[in-house]
């Protein structure tokens, strides 16, 4: 599901695009880098973990892509400025900047150390603002360019037990909308927001877990490659909003119609889910340092949590539809 006008920005350069990707060391970032490398793209890959970045770069180079690795913590504005300078020197021009960094801390808000919540907001909101500040200045000089922000369904509907993550995603959406409005007089500069459902990437396992329970993620989890393909398509057809997964659109509508009923339902759903989940160690994950566990594109959760893609999609859509029915009934009663 996509919205916004179609343009021709980037079509002449998109054959062999020049792209910057932050958060490129695993998951969606790695999948996007590999997809672009297969098209012969010239890439600048950034993340905190040098070893994981180099592994991704090697895969991309085997596809014939030219790749520059720039270890970067996007929470540091000076580091992102340095990344932009190196990217310009290596690429010459930037067709697309993919702002993809994302971390999370799962647990009841009062149980999550406030330092962890701070770090989540700094990475997921301020980090994306640092990316945008660097990218937009390049695009204004070029008079064209595409900024892609990876947001998530959390930008439309808050996720209980992930309060800081939800705050950062709502903030990202507001920031993108404001930035897009400021750039309205520049028809060849685009700010594109991507909102996927839960993605089966290593990010979930890498994140901070203060619940004492194993976090698997609810089905139907998305293949990171599906999200990557949506990002790559933005080179040819930039759009303001890209929603991936049928549940996201349904949740967006239900939240708009009956936000209180929706929030209560989400709280009960995740509360019961965590109560039944196997026990696991409390750990800060990648919030304060790069992941220690291996990266890669996949998280391995789809094989554990889903029997078939079709069956789980039907189940998830059915659950959302049931929640929608309850929410609409509650909304109608409140209007009487």
Model-predicted segments: where are they?
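The beta1-alpha1 cofactor-binding region of Rossmann-like NAD(H)/NADP(H)-dependent oxidoreductases
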Residues: 72-82, 114
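Conserved glycine-rich Rossmann-like NAD(P)H-binding loop of the short-chain dehydrogenase/reductase
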Residues: 41-56
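SDR active-site lid
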Residues: 184-278
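Substrate-binding pocket helix/loop in short-chain dehydrogenase/reductase
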Residues: 108-109, 116-121
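Hydrophobic alpha-helical topogenic segments used for membrane insertion/localization
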Residues: 309-335
């Amino acid at each position: 599901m996509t919205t916004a006008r179609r343009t021709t920005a980037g079509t002449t350069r998109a054959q062999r695009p020049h792209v910057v990707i932050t958060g490129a060391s695993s998951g969606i970032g790695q999948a996007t880098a590999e997809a672009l490398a297969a098209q012969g793209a010239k890439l600048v890959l950034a993340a905190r973990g040098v070893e994981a970045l180099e592994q991704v770069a090697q895969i991309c180079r085997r596809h014939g892509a030219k790749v520059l690795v720039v270890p970067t913590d996007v929470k540091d504005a000076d580091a992102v400025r340095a990344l932009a300078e190196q990217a310009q020197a290596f690429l010459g021009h930037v067709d697309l900047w993919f702002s993809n960094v994302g971390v999370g801390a799962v647990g009841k808000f009062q149980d999550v150390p406030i330092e962890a919540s701070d770090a989540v907001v700094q990475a997921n909101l301020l980090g994306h603002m640092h990316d945008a500040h660097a990218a937009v200045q390049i695009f204004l000089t070029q008079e064209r360019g595409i900024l892609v922000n990876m947001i998530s369904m959390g930008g439309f509907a808050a996720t209980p037990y992930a309060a800081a993550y939800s705050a950062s995603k709502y903030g990202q959406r507001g920031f993108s909308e404001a930035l897009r409005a400021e750039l309205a007089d520049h028809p060849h500069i685009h700010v594109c927001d991507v909102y996927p459902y839960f993605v089966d990437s290593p990010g979930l396992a890498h994140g901070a877990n203060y619940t004492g329970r194993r976090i698997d993620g609810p089905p139907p989890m998305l293949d990171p490659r599906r999200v990557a393909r949506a990002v790559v398509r933005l080179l040819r057809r930039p759009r303001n909003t890209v929603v991936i997964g049928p549940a996201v659109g349904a949740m967006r509508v239900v939240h708009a119609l009956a936000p209180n009923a929706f929030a209560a339902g989400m709280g009960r759903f995740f509360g019961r889910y965590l109560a039944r989940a196997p026990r696991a160690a409390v750990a800060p994950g990648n919030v304060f340092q790069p992941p220690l566990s291996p990266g890669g594109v996949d998280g391995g959760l789809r094989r554990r949590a889903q029997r078939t893609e079709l069956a789980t999609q039907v189940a998830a859509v059915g659950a959302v539809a049931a929640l929608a029915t309850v929410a609409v009934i509650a909304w109608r009663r409140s209007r009487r």
